């Protein structure tokens, strides 16, 4: 496995692949990798086969962090990450410095569709999806993959990026990787490392709240808004500060109508809440 830090070295490393018309699968990450990231790399490898090339990027993207968020304390663990990526099937790691990817202020940005990007995460983290779309579009332009793999744990992000690829007619197949969970059900996340021992145990309450909410919505008997408000109240009583707990249509993340719920329309429960100093997200389809 090769590790490169500059655009010139990346392009040189990929030149033989392009000359041979090989398939490139790309897995963008911010590093501090866990088994969920490695599963995405394995999925990329499986998609392109032994003859393909799997590229992973490691870059903590300042554009998607608000000033009060955890950009400065987000762990940078390149040496450890590289040790994990090689046996997972990665061929090439692109780990640029900020000045390499943004040599001057990034004044041209990708503004995602507000109908999707200003809901939920976009509402509570203004500018987040603009930062995500801008860096991913830039990385797509640099790497020029035929396949890209993103985790379904970031459910709304995956939807936004799929729409971006579609809207710009990019020749990229976007794959979603299933959320991996610890043995007790906690969704794997780089930010789980911020949790203390007691918080780590308590963190299971978020997925439990989503599961209960989804079940209550499917059972009917109360309006969706009432059930969502009750779920937030219950989680708040357990010491959390919820941004949202909601059930939405999988197609557009809009609230389902009562008739759609009764008809068994595919739904997803999504939640974001702060436990102590750590903001966690999760989702469950059902």
Swiss-Prot record:
A Pfam family matched in the record: Pantoate_ligase
Role according to the record: Catalyzes the condensation of pantoate with beta-alanine in an ATP-dependent reaction via a pantoyl-adenylate intermediate.
GO biological process, one term: pantothenate biosynthetic process
Any one GO MF annotation of this record: pantoate-beta-alanine ligase activity
UniProt-annotated binding residues for ATP: 30-37, 151-154, 180, 188-191
Main localisation: cytoplasm
Assigned keywords, A-Z: ATP-binding, Cytoplasm, Ligase, Nucleotide-binding, Pantothenate biosynthesis
InterPro entries associated with the record: Pantoate_ligase (IPR003721), Pantoate_ligase_C (IPR042176), Rossmann-like_a/b/a_fold (IPR014729)
Pathway assignment: Cofactor biosynthesis; (R)-pantothenate biosynthesis; (R)-pantothenate from (R)-pantoate and beta-alanine: step 1/1
Residue numbers binding beta-alanine: 64
Catalysed transformations (reactions): (R)-pantoate + beta-alanine + ATP = (R)-pantothenate + AMP + diphosphate + H(+)
EC number annotated for this UniProt entry: 6.3.2.1
Keyword 4Fe-4S: no
Cellular localisation: Cytoplasm
Similarity comment text for this entry: Belongs to the pantothenate synthetase family.
Subunit architecture: Homodimer.
Positions bound to (R)-pantoate: 64, 157
Gene3D superfamilies: HUPs, Pantoate-beta-alanine ligase, C-terminal domain
A GO CC term attached to the entry: cytosol
Active-site residue list: 37 (proton donor)
Keyword Nucleus belongs to the record: no
Additional observations: The reaction proceeds by a bi uni uni bi ping pong mechanism.
Protein name: Pantothenate synthetase
